[in-house]
């Protein structure tokens, strides 16, 4: 059997491929904040799309990829409602999973949980952008308020692969808002073989704290907002500090920091690179439904 893999496409866009099926988390490809890593052709194999929350760099490209590939989109009630009524995706291609629910689709068992996002005040962001004359930040705030379900709940996923491996997408949950009790409850509820999670800002201690409780066998960290934070005048600690913190939290785990274009074999932890597909190199899949 072909080994299961995780690929990282930049931002919070990741894929998990197992047993011939591919699920994408928060696929996002458009040029944004100076980054232009991949294109829609690179998401052509999508069978499923899982939305973690409604901020624009997690959401804006989901409708177009879903239309092109006929992937089934999984998200909270707020996210699927927005996709149905504001973006015109048919109801039969939307699968609503709210917090602490579960289902199965061909290739994956899927369970959900809630996590807490660092504080974001959209009104304050607009005001600050106006005062500073930061048109990029202003465009982000306006787009977030009008083109995506900004206040959709923050939702993580745990996938169970056909061989029993569990993959948790913790997204941006490594932060000071998550309490020790909440993390412990996740660890009691789920066995975590692989955790996918963001590394950003000064949340180094929170990476160690979370990994120490979850005790995964593999930790795959990615930088969800480096380019965005640079646009906002913020920066994050070096990647090496996050990986060291994760390793300290789970000394026996395989820890990998993902740059865009990184692929990890979930069987043995080997790391390789994949390249952006040239425009037109690969046609998008024919319109055949993959809904369960």
Q: Which residues does each predicted region cover?
A:
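Pre-active-site segment of Zn-dependent metallo-hydrolases
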Residues: 15-67, 119-147, 173-190, 290
């Amino acid at each position: 059997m072909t080994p299961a893999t995780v690929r990282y496409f930049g931002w919070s866009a990741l894929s998990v491929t197992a047993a011939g099926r591919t699920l994408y988390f928060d696929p996002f490809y458009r040029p944004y904040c100076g980054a232009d890593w991949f294109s829609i052709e690179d998401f052509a194999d999508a069978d499923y799309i899982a939305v973690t929350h409604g901020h624009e760099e997690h959401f804006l490209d989901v409708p177009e990829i879903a239309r092109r590939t006929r992937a089934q989109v999984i998200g909270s009630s707020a996210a699927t409602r927005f996709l149905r009524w504001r973006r015109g995706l048919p109801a039969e291609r939307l699968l609503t999973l709210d917090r602490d629910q579960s289902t199965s689709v061909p290739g994956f068992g899927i369970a959900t949980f809630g996590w807490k996002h660092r504080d974001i005040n959209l009104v304050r962001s607009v005001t600050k952008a106006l005062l500073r004359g930061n048109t990029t930040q202003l465009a982000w705030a306006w787009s977030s308020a009008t083109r995506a379900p900004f206040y959709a709940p923050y939702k993580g996923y745990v996938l169970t692969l056909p061989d029993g491996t569990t993959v948790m997408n913790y997204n941006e949950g490594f932060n000071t808002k998550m309490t020790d009790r909440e993390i412990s409850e996740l660890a009691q509820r789920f066995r975590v073989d692989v955790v996918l999670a963001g590394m950003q800002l000064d949340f180094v201690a929170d990476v160690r704290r979370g990994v120490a409780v979850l005790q995964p066998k593999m930790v795959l960290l990615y930088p969800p907002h480096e380019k965005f934070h640079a646009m906002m005048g913020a920066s994050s600690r070096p990647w090496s500090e996050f990986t060291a913190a994760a390793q300290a939290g789970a000394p026996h785990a395989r820890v990998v920091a993902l740059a865009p274009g990184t692929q990890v074999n979930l069987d043995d932890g080997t790391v390789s690179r994949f390249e952006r597909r040239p425009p037109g190199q690969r046609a998008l899949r024919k319109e055949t439904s993959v809904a369960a």
